[in-house]
């Protein structure tokens, strides 16, 4: 789950706050639409090391204005889109521990990745992934990147392979 570009202005949206109902509904409809049209990869949650099973304090709300952040109780809050509905597959990033043999090592949760036994569905490699670099880093055009944005394409690829073998399967 990656909050690099979470749905402003809150990292966690509260279903009980009337002012946030329209935003939650819009996100929910967009995800339903995407689900009905096939596999979609959204890397939009953040590398906040949050426990999605037990959200407590939202330190980045609202995050649009520097210095305007306020802490608020977000128990029962929703991190959009990862926690929005059952059609969303929430991905956590994992990595090989430093200095271990890839053939025998056990993967560990990447230190930046969000987590939760009931709110994260799958884990995929997300640390030190060889990838194309952003356009502003043109020399060289490839390098190592880390983040759940690196893990979610792995999960989407597996979902696409499963869909190829089982075309009758749905996102549910």
What positions do the PLM features span?
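Hydrolase catalytic cores
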Residues: 1, 124-172
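Catalytic-core segments of hydrolase enzymes
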Residues: 1-133
């Amino acid at each position: 789950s990656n909050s690099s570009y979470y749905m402003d202005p809150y990292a966690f949206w509260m279903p009980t706050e009337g002012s946030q109902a329209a935003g939650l509904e819009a996100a929910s409809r967009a995800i339903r639409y995407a689900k009905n049209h096939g596999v979609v990869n959204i890397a939009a949650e953040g590398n906040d090391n949050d426990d999605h099973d037990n959200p407590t304090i939202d330190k980045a709300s609202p995050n649009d204005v520097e210095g305007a952040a306020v802490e608020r109780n977000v128990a029962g809050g929703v991190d959009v889109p990862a926690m929005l509905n059952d059609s969303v597959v929430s991905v956590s990033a994992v990595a090989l521990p430093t200095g271990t043999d890839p053939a025998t090592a056990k993967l560990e949760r990447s230190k930046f990745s969000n987590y939760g036994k009931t709110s994260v569905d799958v884990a995929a490699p997300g640390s030190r992934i060889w990838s194309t670099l952003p356009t502003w880093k043109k020399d060289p055009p490839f390098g190592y990147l880390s983040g759940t944005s690196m893990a979610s394409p792995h999960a989407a690829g597996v979902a696409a392979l499963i869909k190829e073998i089982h075309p009758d399967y749905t996102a549910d």
